[in-house]
């Protein structure tokens, strides 16, 4: 029997509105190949995504800025102009021609934006962040703590970007809530030291992310929406002392707010941004199992990413109901390794 016939990784699964033929997902990968001035995806992006599409497979796009002011990184595509929407439509058409599905990852940088690119670097709180600690040559940004008016405006950006995604032919969206970017900055005390209704207790720190989630779900339907989290990552100055004390309640809050959500996408503890430590000795509480248990009690699907190989993905899928997202293996093309997708 073939690998495809003998492993759960290649069994069909319904994720929100889409009926997938297997559980192998393209993880969002920052490519930085868009036009530097217009943030329009490059013409060859359609070929890039089509190469990674498969019949009944799910791709999650590179992070895509929801508005110009949400950016602050060069050559990253946007989804806030008609020119950008038209360019993305050629990409989604190419994926659909291969029988695949594609979700757009909606992205806002927050305090890690480059101040040379955007006039205001927005932040959840006033906790200093030194970009040089991540290997960047940029000095620490002078950022602006978001007011309630700013927060409401950004919620509107997310909502409009979700609508633009559907216009561009995407099958859904993933809200980027991981890796120390804006939504993650509200969730964690490493960056959120606010004393108003958006800071302090978990309920307050969840307020902005939930507003975004609810606005996006209202705009395009919860079965077209996923959200990403990275509970254990130290990337960009993040990580709570007790990550699960934040992210288990966060998963519960997500599912309570949107029980028909398509998926929650979590990053494994061995990953921090673009770096991984496959042989790292994990602490006892460094485990996605408690979050998986929360998600497993609902209709929401659970996607995991971080350092998987074809062999470990097959073993993981056999033990769980998870979908497994690959990044670097998709760059090298899984099909070159005889993966049956």
Residue ranges and their predicted role:
Residues 1-341:
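Flavin-dependent oxidoreductase catalytic cores
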